[in-house]
Amino acid sequence: LDTGIDDTLALLYVLSKRDEINLLGITAVFGNVETRVSARNSLTILDLFDRKDVPVYLGQAAPYGKESYKVKEEVQLIHGKNGLGNVSFPTSNREIKDDGIKFIRDMILAHPGDITIVPTGPLTNIAALYERFPEVLKVEHEIISMGGALTVEGNVTEVAEANYYKDPIGAGIVFSKNISLKMICLDVTQQSHLYPSYINKWNGYKGNLIKSMVEFYINFHKVGYCYLHDPSAVCAILHPEYFTFLNIPLYVTSQGRV
């Protein structure tokens, strides 16, 4: 997770399906916020909703070939400076664990054929996994990635979607591997909307915090709703019947040529 607003909604979706999804852990990555902020945000949401049993690990702090990552001002306009719509949540003081890449590797090896990884940010952690631990490529696991744009315009450039744009080299590494990868792209997620009439049903202390966060997100979009980008990727685990998947070869280029 690069825990911004729609990542938080995706996490809450998972937490609401505890009988159907066994959440083994979260690895943080850069994107909507810096990696360490992402990790702290994830812990904050987990603790608020009584899931202190779920560990959070640090992942990669910068795109492939880069030494650092700085959140752009336009991203802060979407998710707020804290990634949570500038809403003051009770901060978790739980430990952020190190080496999220090894954690993913350990979980794949411990649960062969029964692991689904849902990257809702740049694919840098997954690229690092395959580069550092190539043995996992021989073990069955599934990736459901929120990213990309095929038949619609990107949301950063005319062709680029934000998650893959932030690390095209990392995305390219992942797409070059012979793995089970489902891409939940803007073509799908921009058809999934969250309206004020729905969030107005949320109440109580926790509900009002989340409502305030989502209101920030809706106000940015200026169309009367917000897109459910990352929750759509989680939905693909629980309800694959809602989706039509096309089995096609894809690759990522960072050279400006298609």
Stretches found by the model and what they are:
Residues L1-T44, R51-K52, E67, K81-N82, ...:
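Active-site histidine-anchored catalytic micro-motif
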Residues Y13-L23, A162-I169, I184-V258:
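Conformational coupling and interaction surfaces
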Residues V56, V174, V234:
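A residue-level signal for conserved active-site and pocket-lining positions in enzyme catalytic cores
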Residues E73-V75:
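Large eukaryotic, non-enzymatic subunits of multiprotein complexes that serve as scaffolds/tethers
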